[in-house]
Amino acid sequence: MSTFDNAVSIHPYFKVREGQLEACKSFLTRFNEKVAGEAKCLFYNFTFQGDVMCCREAYQDAEGVQAHLENVGALLGELLKIADLTRIELHGPAPELEKLKPVFAEMNPEYFICECGIGR
């Protein structure tokens, strides 16, 4: 079984508040340090287009996503003082996404169900 069979990726988009872009970029190293020890994290990085930031992240399964949220919850609260969450997408197999619906309900995410693909 590939580690990608149950993999879930999360794509939250943030609008960095005016004048906070450099502070936001500096803050991200704290996330990286915290996430580095997560056993079920497949990848975790940040991309930017102007003042819009996206965190590209994936986990082996829904359990890995839940562990991640517990790990970075306090940091996310701090980030939301300088950036606003504008959109969040969850991608993965339907059974794994179902497990996460109660966890993400208040964030009003868009769910994308994986129908086919390959993993290495």
Model-derived regions, located:
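Long, charge-enriched, surface-exposed interaction segments in small proteins/subunits
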Residues: G73-A74
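Short S/T/G/P-rich N-terminal loop/turn motif that feeds into the first structured element of a domain
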Residues: M1-C54, Q60-E70, K81-R120
